[in-house]
Amino acid sequence: MSKKVLASITAMALLSAVFTWGCKQAMAEPILQREYDLAEERSLEARYYHMETKVVYFEEDGTRQPPFTFRLHLTCAPAGRSPQDGYKYTCAKVTYQKGDGAEVRIPSLDGWSYLFKRTKNGGFDQGGVVLGIDHGKFQGLKDSNGNALPPEMAYMIYNMFIDFHAFCNDFAQRTASGKGIQDLKRIGQKIVHAAAFSEPSTELSDNIEEGSKFVNGEVTLEFKGLSVVEGVPCALVGFDSGDSSFVMLVKPTPDLEVKTVGASHYWGDLYIELESRWVRKVTMGELVVCKVNMGGHKSVNSVVERSTTIRAVEKSKFQQLARGA
């Protein structure tokens, strides 16, 4: 084959590749450059969610302890004919599992329902209660074996409900004061969220003392792009808590106070259905580093890794997952 023919073939191939790339770019530009309304009202329908959180404690030498795995099965149904009427959430099942041990159920939460809706000021907190989730429901919990859950375990279960609504509502829906997902119009935009540098209430338990506080860092949301989850087109929105800090004062017994001081950083992604605006999937990772002082005892340094996945599932799949334990 002559050099001229080879050069001609090479040039034609290059032109074809450039033309194909140009066509793809022309098709992609309207999608990538258009404006989206991610805060549009959600479709009025029932939803079914499976949530799993794994908590891993590290020894001071870096050894990983067997993980605690918490699972929440939550249904959601319209409470009225309008989204303004809110949604009725029902807990079908909550379980925990240590390492490879048996999955253990929390019977008192089976069938527990609550109304989740915006208040008159547009927020989700109800009467000073964080996201309207009554922490009293999580006092004195016992598992299906009749064992009383220690306060830290009960708090982790309570916190699953808080995390669920923080990600699926606080981050994924319009904020009343601005600085929310409604400000993300184009792919590539990033905002500082209204939750940045705030101090959420720490009145989470009768054992938590005055002086406890959690301070958010620079919480951000970023419109990363578009994705597909199980065949459903979604907007991909990243979140990052920045450098958060906390002080927790707990009295497990009248004569013992435990003071925990530390820092937290969590980050993850929301997958929001483009058609319905419901959250299809959430992934979250968190690292917590703290020092625990138990009265006159030696202080203990603690490192905790936490990962969470929330998935919307079909009703039949939900019923299958909610069986057992």
Annotate each predicted stretch with a short phrase:
Residues 1-11:
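Bacterial N-terminal signal peptides that target proteins for export
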Residues 10-20:
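Bacterial N-terminal signal peptides
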Residues 26-325:
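Signature of exported/secreted
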